[in-house]
A protein has these predicted regions:
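A structural signal for multi-pass alpha-helical bundles of membrane permease subunits
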Residues: 5-294
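N-terminal hydrophobic targeting signals that begin at the initiator methionine
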Residues: 1-3
Length: 294
């Protein structure tokens, strides 16, 4: 019996072997190279061993902490509004309304998710330009002086919120779809029993809906944290990290340090720190998934 089980395990690992080898080549080797490069001062001619000097310089640079804080703000702002908007729209679409109307709105609301981040960013650049749709709308309704314009992407106060707003608009349909699927899986009997007991709408939402969706909410929030924290396209397309680094996030500052300033070792140290943060979030996510399966 044990011999047969051992044979089955060997056979399974033999099938997994090529895939694991390919995974190692595509992921482990590049990661090892980045860690190695972070320990060197690298220019186009030579590599000089500096140990942890890149990390020491990085942690003593005020710009790094500013960028890290902006990355956290961008990530948390996006995830919170993804959840709030997605939950609200999922609840609306789950109400008992005309099926055709519900399907129509479901199709319309999912449209932002169909755009690639680069395309969505370019659309919002046009909308937020000094002579774009948003300023025109504000002028029309009397909230903006006709002789004045707001440079949404050119002001340190509004650049990062503008990029965050675009990211919220583009990705909220993912939350809406996932939460709507979760709502449809909740048995109606539970709500009917609550109605018989005279339970209010708020209590049904808080004590039935939220606990039933807890697993889905935790999973999609963790995933969205990981995806948003490493988002490069929205910031690069809309502001390039400016003005004066006010919308810079970790992925863009790594890109600029590596390919514009040619500080490959320093940029590698930044990448390692970002990897450690994302790795921690990934461990939490994997443990959550394993707990659900087991």
């Amino acid at each position: 019996m044990l011999r047969q089980r051992f044979r089955h395990e060997i056979q399974a690992y033999s099938f997994l072997g090529p895939a694991l080898l390919l995974l190692g080549l595509l992921m482990v080797y590049p990661l090892g190279q980045v860690i190695r490069m972070s320990l060197y001062e690298i220019n186009l001619r030579k590599e000089t061993w500096v140990g942890l000097a890149n990390y020491a310089e990085l942690l003593q640079t005020p710009l790094f902490w500013q960028v890290l804080w902006q990355t956290v703000l961008f990530t948390v702002g996006s995830v919170v509004f993804h959840l709030l908007i997605g939950m609200g729209l999922a609840l609306l679409l789950h109400t008992k309304i005309n099926v055709r109307i519900r399907n129509l709105f479901r199709g319309l609301l999912i449209i932002p998710w169909l755009f690639a981040p680069t395309v969505a960013g370019m659309i919002w650049v046009l909308m937020l330009s000094p002579f774009g749709v948003l300023n025109g709308l504000l002028t029309t309704v009397g909230l903006l002086d006709p002789n004045a314009t707001i440079t949404w992407l050119g002001s340190p106060q509004t650049a990062l919120p503008s990029v965050t707003a675009m990211n919220i608009w583009r990705a909220f349909p993912f939350f809406m779809v996932m939460l709507l699927a979760g709502l449809q899986a909740i048995p109606e009997d539970i709500y009917e029993a609550a109605d018989i007991d005279g339970t209010t709408t708020w209590k049904k939402f808080w004590y039935i809906t939220i606990p039933s969706l807890r697993g889905i909410i935790l999973t999609i929030v963790l995933l969205d944290f990981i995806w948003t924290f490493r988002a490069f396209d929205p910031v690069y397309v809309m502001t390039g990290g400016g003005p004066v680094n006010s919308s810079q996030v970790l992925p863009t500052v790594i890109y600029f340090d590596a390919f514009q300033k040619l500080k490959f070792g320093y940029a590698s140290a930044e990448a390692v720190i970002m990897f450690l943060i994302l790795f921690g979030l990934s461990v939490v996510y994997v443990r959550r998934v394993v707990r659900e399966i087991v």
